[in-house]
A protein has these predicted regions:
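Accessory helical-bundle/CTD segments and flexible terminal tails appended to RecA-like ATPase motors
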Residues: 1-186
């Protein structure tokens, strides 16, 4: 039961990655690094299928290689190049693969802002920040004061979001809009 609660808190993919790293550390005789999460980027969960379908790319080895390359991309340009390469090699991207790339872009932006987790579903969700995020604090205050029914702080590091987002396009637009709003002013 404790594990399922922890899994829900950080997201399944990140949870399994952290668990795997912890097991490797223990096997090597070291203590797991609890601050490791901050160095490996934001967890973005939009509750949408985000994958490379078997029907699009049947070879599991090639799919795994592409997943690793998407995960390793350090900027939007690298993601766009990879999209073009996949379209050239395998044809137009199915919806799930488009979601995968869009979430990878959101993850890059969220990581740069110091967001630990961005979770948006049908009814909204939350943003969890690292201890010292790179966001404009006034933008958070303006969101909460301007739309108190939709935004509120839930503890010192979580922004709770209450919005109807039943459509994937609405969810992506809301996520992009929030990340843009939170950008620090230059």
């Amino acid at each position: 039961e404790d594990q399922s609660g922890q899994m829900a808190e950080v997201g399944f993919s990140l949870y399994t990655e952290l668990l795997e790293r912890a097991v490797k550390s223990i096997k090597a005789g070291k203590l797991p690094d609890v601050d490791d999460i901050d160095r490996h980027g934001a967890d973005v969960e939009l509750h949408l299928p985000a994958l490379i379908p078997d029907a699009y790319l049947p070879d599991p080895h090639t799919r795994l290689t592409l997943y690793k390359r998407i995960s390793a991309a350090r900027d939007v340009a690298a993601l766009r190049e990879l999209q073009v390469e996949m379209i050239d090699r395998f044809g137009l991207l199915p919806e799930q693969a488009k979601h995968l790339f869009a979430i990878a872009e959101l993850k890059l932006d969220a990581t740069a802002l110091g967001i630990r987790k961005l979770d948006l579903g049908n009814k909204g969700g939350r943003i969890q920040f690292v201890e010292k995020p790179n966001v404009d604090p006034m933008s958070v205050i303006r969101l909460i004061q301007g739309q108190p029914k939709h935004y509120r702080m839930d503890g010192p590091d979580k922004l709770r979001i209450t919005l109807e987002l039943p459509d994937p396009a609405l969810r992506f637009n809301a996520a992009r809009g929030l990340l843009t709003t939170l950008q620090p002013t230059q």
